[in-house]
Amino acid sequence: MKLSRRDFMKANAAVAAAAAAGLTIPTVVQAAAGSADSIKWDKAPCRFCGTGCGVLVGTQNGRIVASQGDPEAAVNRGLSCIKGYFLPKIMYGKDRLNQPLLRMKDGQYHKEGEFTPVSWQQAFDIMAEKFKQALKEKGPEAVGMFGSGQWTVWEGYAAAKLLKAGLRSNNLDPNARHCMASAVVGFMRTFGMDEPMGCYDDIEQADAFVLWGSNMAEMHPILWSRITDRRLSNEKVNVSVLSTFEHRSFELADNGMVFTPQTDLAIMNYIANYIIQNNAVDQDFLNRHVNFRRGATDIGYGLRPTDPLEKAAKNPGSDASDPMSFEEYKAFVADYTLEKTAKMSGVPEDQLEALAKLYADPNIKVVSYWTMGFNQHTRGVWANNLCYNLHLLTGKISKPGCGPFSLTGQPSACGTAREVGTFAHRLPADMVVTNEKHRQTAEQKWQLPAGTIPAKVGLHAVAQDRALKDGTLNAYWVMCNNNMQAGPNINEDRMPGWRDARNFVVVSDPYPTVSALAADLILPTAMWVEKEGAYGNAERRTQFWRQQVKAPGEAKSDLWQLVEFSKRFTVEEVWPAELLAQKPEYRGKTLYDVLFANGEVNKYPLTEIPADQLNDEARDFGFYLQKGLFEEYAGFGRGHGHDLAPFDSYHQARGLRWPVVEGKETLWRYREGTDPYVKAGEEVRFYGKPDGKAVIFALPFEPAAESPDKEYDLWLSTGRVLEHWHTGSMTRRVPELHRAFPQAVVFIHPLDAKSRNLRRGEKVRVLSRRGELISTVETRGRNRPPRGLVYMPFFDAAQLVNNLTLDATDPLSKEVDFKKCAVKLEKV
């Protein structure tokens, strides 16, 4: 599309609107000055967070030269945050990788060799050799992959097919394990289905917003602009923010609360108690739509079995629960009184009571938002469940302006990591590998012999680190993430495992990240609009984009790498004789033939792609690969509450929210009149559960795995900042973003700094029981910790904060608690 006068006027009008929200929009005028007629524009979702903003991408002479917020995108309405403003520049870092690099010595692969350019043929030769060796010597459990919530939908789906069906290994896990796993398990326990029931439209209809461990002002700034607009345009709207430290979201808060780490569990039980004691329960809703259960307690911390904390746990890893009555639940939460909760949490009584009244008042529509503060938590699943309790008790759920909403941090943590089944325990559309019927469904759709997919849950992210160190996971492929920097406790398991001579580690990445430089083989990867893609955002909105430029040099998309690598294996090399006996026609065929040239994936011809439209993968393989993968995948969910629209619909729309039935998207799930799966007269049906009822869980406060003591006397919480995304592998290569926040700092209370004889701007050594780093003291600015807590972002590769963190996880979700460990400071 060409830049028109109408587009010019739209862009300038949007700038004025953005200024009021404290946001920026790159104007088309600046990007296209003097050459408007030669810029081609096309739509795409933003490459960064899970909000799913729509952008217009301007290309010229084979390069991205501009971007702007898409005025037709319902999510962001033409706005861009500061990261979105600079999207074009993430593609063109000076150190962009453009050919495979293998550690070599004397012309051969060597674990301690220097990175040396090789061809794709050579790269896949050594990869295939190492994967086949691991399979032959130890079987499918010796191979694995760590994927991403930044994969496109079809990349994640192809990875699931290759690992779980082809190589017969469930050792596939995404980096979304580190951010969204607790939300997944929380949804499944309470509702029997994953992902939020509401949508962003709730913002304009809610009377109150409660943020639980979510700094939306910096992490989801476009959504925050909509909340800000709602709050400032209606004086009756209330914003409450809960966190373990003050941050920018507190600036809008009517009720900002800083609580002692881990005590959010107690606060939610207090609110439930308040609702019951003040007769604010929607009893009719409970009777018709809710069951009560008491969950197992003292479930451990996901550490190695030899750890003293695991040995001491009475029910390590238990997801068990027993039925209970409403009266029994009432008695359970009665222990969480206002006085007790205020003392535990450090939040004043009047603020706690004001918060409870929002949920209890039947005339106030409440939306609860959370991200990592809940999920990265040793009781993260419980935290999710307890928040659902509040909405279920009051009936404030699945209707406009009311509901619990788990926000996501990656662009397709929902659409790819969760929906297509790239977790070690999952298959597409909420199915799981431990369920025989689910495995049979997948095997039938994938045309596999019965028994191909293993029933055993694979290794989750932290378990992969431990298995690498222990030498039981030997061939390992990391795609579209920087886990050596982003994962916990780098020194004890991950780095030793990656550098163990028994193991061969491959990293696919556009840049030489900390992870890439720790690998044995680096594969150069196409980015964003250098390929055709699809993401699924936090409100169940699936969005497509077309390839708009070519990748540099020999860089190839993750999809191409996965599908091309499958050609290196014959079925005889990876499947036992008893499987082949069921499908003798597969003898002599490759995994590519069985998985991707199977009559389904390859049935859409190249003629469906316009002749002038870039699509490198499709033309390399000779068919419309992306469409074939999507339509095969979509077959899992259609008719089962996960309905996706036909492939071609998404290239026309600015995204559609599933389930999409008869061309109509669903804004609010489980509610009669808005969800096609709820029949007339049912009012509400939580159809993920066999009886259609959600579950309220009785779950207590339990302490963190590690707390400050006499020696390590401070809490450490980690996270992000507005200017950088995750490990900074993209944003730190944008000069403007790097200058805005060039290095990580330690945010600390001024009195804590003073008592340690530390001054702002001085160097300080931060130490935990696992490692140390040197950083800079910051006593001012956007983040204001209380006494006893310090905060550090993890974007800085020169300050690996995850040298400090503990690899304790929620035992149910296996998600790491990056928010709570103990550290001490030493003056340098």
Swiss-Prot record:
Localization in the cell: Periplasm
SUPFAM superfamilies associated with the record: ADC-like (SSF50692), Formate dehydrogenase/DMSO reductase, domains 1-3 (SSF53706)
Residues spanning the signal sequence: 1-33
GO biological process: cellular respiration; Mo-molybdopterin cofactor biosynthetic process; nitrate assimilation
Residues binding substrate, per UniProt: 794
Pfam families: Molybdop_Fe4S4 (PF04879), Molybdopterin (PF00384), Molydop_binding (PF01568), TAT_signal (PF10518)
GO cellular component: membrane; nitrate reductase complex; periplasmic space
The EC number(s) this enzyme carries: 1.9.6.1
Keywords: 4Fe-4S, Electron transport, Iron, Iron-sulfur, Metal-binding, Molybdenum, Nitrate assimilation, Oxidoreductase, Periplasm, Signal, Transport
HAMAP family: Nitrate_reduct_NapA (MF_01630)
Family recorded in the similarity comment: Belongs to the prokaryotic molybdopterin-containing oxidoreductase family. NasA/NapA/NarB subfamily.
Complex and partners: Component of the periplasmic nitrate reductase NapAB complex composed of NapA and NapB.
Function in brief: Catalytic subunit of the periplasmic nitrate reductase complex NapAB. Receives electrons from NapB and catalyzes the reduction of nitrate to nitrite.
Protein name as annotated: Periplasmic nitrate reductase
Protein's organism: Serratia proteamaculans (strain 568)
Lineage summary: Bacteria, Pseudomonadati, Pseudomonadota, Gammaproteobacteria, Enterobacterales
